[in-house]
């Protein structure tokens, strides 16, 4: 069975984020993208437009001492892609490992809207409460 085109888009986006490759992300993310970051974190909220999303993605890594994300799975359909990943975070001597989901709505080969969600929102809230 051939790889779904949205799976390839997700993998390309994952690789671009890992390399801080804004140019490639600019080809994958729609100019008017809306990114919904859920969970009780310093970067929670809606990020509107490509520049705001690129800034958000940069800030995620800047606010932590260690941010190591490992891709677990990619699931795709004609209009959506779901990325499942594990993240290890260290901040001010504290450590946490957590599963995350990224769901993207794809139109015309570009991500138009994205939602991120931690699999254990309570653990995430406790980590950032200190």
Q: Which residues does each PLM region occupy?
A:
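C-terminal and inter-domain tail/linker signature
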Residues: 1-130
